[in-house]
Amino acid sequence: MPMQGAQRRLLGSLNSTPTATPNLGLAANHTGAPCLEVSIPDGLFLSLGLVSLVENVLVVAAIAKNRNLHSPMYCFICCLALSDLLVSGSNMLEMAVILLLEAGALATRASVVQQLQNTIDVLTCSSMLCSLCFLGAIAVDRYVSIFYALRYHSIVTLPRARRAIAAIWVASVLSSTLFIAYCDHAAVLLCLVVFFLAMLVLMAVLYVHMLARACQHAQGITRLHKRQLPAHQGFGLRGAATLTILLGIFFLCWGPFFLHLMLVVLCPQHLTCSCIFKNFKVFLTLIICNTIIDPLIYAFRSQELCRTLREVLLCSW
């Protein structure tokens, strides 16, 4: 993967553009036409990564500490936090190496840097794939708990959850290794885009179906108690708003990154696409933001987990 001036992206296989300068302005492409280039300062990028790192470490520690949280659902949430932790940690490591190389504080041979680059690439890609997979696994788990409530504990057992988790990690590591090895092939990038779209469709279908079932249940309760219809409509609106936020955050945080991959395949030399490529670091930052938001959506809404988290924090003091 090529050098990108003084700063080089260790995900250079995905980013064919130089790192942005610390401002927001119009940068010229190779034809001199202006391009909107949004720069993310290194300090902000590292700060967001640190927040994500601390947040997800706390989630993993809380789930590991409390045996009541060793259920399949919390195992998936723990693995989501762990994969998000690796996403933010690998990007922070990448940025730290870039800054050290740029400052001349890290002097090493090119072969060593290349090996480190490949290692971080595999770690980053596998953790991203794991994060997407566990978001889908959580959606499936919630779907089964609602539509097969009486059989849930016989369907989603802890051994099955552990096997699914192991399969996700192994498949993610193997596929990311192949991705790094064959990153110049368009089919590889398209497979990643298709995978993202499949996860998006899966989550949308499952959560919309769950919302429809919840609305039917609420409607049945209102009829039983002879209440007015607006109460049910209010519940439906709240559920729709929650669903929109959930899927909207997922799409807004992950979509630009996979749009970048798709454009690398479809229009690598097009002027408009080249302008989009200049904002690659913004797309990575959005993914880091998603790793910060995930615990707020999936973990911290649990009273049991929050109580354990307070115990962990008190013990650390």
UniProtKB/Swiss-Prot annotation:
SMART domains: 7TM_GPCR_Srsx. Receptor for MSH (alpha, beta and gamma) and ACTH. The activity of this receptor is mediated by G proteins which activate adenylate cyclase. Mediates melanogenesis, the production of eumelanin (black/brown) and phaeomelanin (red/yellow), via regulation of cAMP signaling in melanocytes. It comes from Alouatta pigra (Guatemalan howler monkey). This is Melanocyte-stimulating hormone receptor. It comes from the Eukaryota. Interacts with MGRN1, but does not undergo MGRN1-mediated ubiquitination; this interaction competes with GNAS-binding and thus inhibits agonist-induced cAMP production. Interacts with OPN3; the interaction results in a decrease in MC1R-mediated cAMP signaling and ultimately a decrease in melanin production in melanocytes. InterPro entries: GPCR_Rhodpsn, GPCR_Rhodpsn_7TM, Melcrt_ACTH_rcpt, MSH_rcpt. Residues 1-37, 94-118, 184-191, 267-279 are extracellular. Glycans are attached at N29. The gene is MC1R. Residues 64-72, 141-163, 212-240, 301-317 are cytoplasmic. Belongs to the G-protein coupled receptor 1 family.
